[in-house]
């Protein structure tokens, strides 16, 4: 019983981790590791071809097609061949990435959603654990034992739903704790109004200066 409850919890936890981190992020990490092990030679060839193509382009740009036509034509043929080889290598890596993405998505679905469905259906009649007698009303007891577990027990499907709810609530709590607090709003500046109030005084001072000049 305890092992089954733990297995269902771990499957639910794995599913939630995939949801939290993101499928695309996990796929990118997995493909990077896969490329490092199985596609290192092709990736090295791609880098070498890209470097050679850039060098050939630079040298071709420095060569005059009129004054050095033979050299220019040779460089042009070399550049065209390098571009063709680079495109072929890029297509190989792109095809490998597409194939890996499909296999990874299938494997991830089997390990998360598929495993949860299989466990809930295969152990649908087996109670995960029993509740104390009379601890919950009959409608709640029937709901916890849905679809085929004995009344008074918690079924595999109900246990999986409880685990998902607890993990989702835990995620919300962590996000609310780590979320930055809103910045406090400061007092509204009163600069323009004070400037307006100072204008009459300035006018009075100007008039006083004019009277002094006249005197």
From Swiss-Prot:
Residues 73-94 form a coiled coil. GO terms for molecular function: protein-membrane adaptor activity. Residues 1-4, 130-153 are lumenal. It is found in: Endoplasmic reticulum membrane. GO terms for cellular component: endoplasmic reticulum membrane; GET complex. The chain crosses the membrane at residues 5-24, 109-129, 154-170. The gene is GET1. Belongs to the WRB/GET1 family. Required for the post-translational delivery of tail-anchored (TA) proteins to the endoplasmic reticulum. Acts as a membrane receptor for soluble GET3, which recognizes and selectively binds the transmembrane domain of TA proteins in the cytosol. Residues 181-202 are annotated as: Disordered. It is a multi-pass membrane protein. Keywords: Coiled coil, Endoplasmic reticulum, Membrane, Transmembrane, Transmembrane helix, Transport. InterPro entries: Get1, Get1_fungi, Helix_hairpin_bin_sf. Disulfide bonds: none annotated. Interacts with GET3. It comes from Cryptococcus neoformans var. neoformans serotype D (strain B-3501A). It comes from the Eukaryota. One of its GO terms (biological process) is tail-anchored membrane protein insertion into ER membrane. The keyword Manganese does not apply. Residues 25-108, 171-215 are cytoplasmic. HAMAP family: Get1. This is Protein GET1.
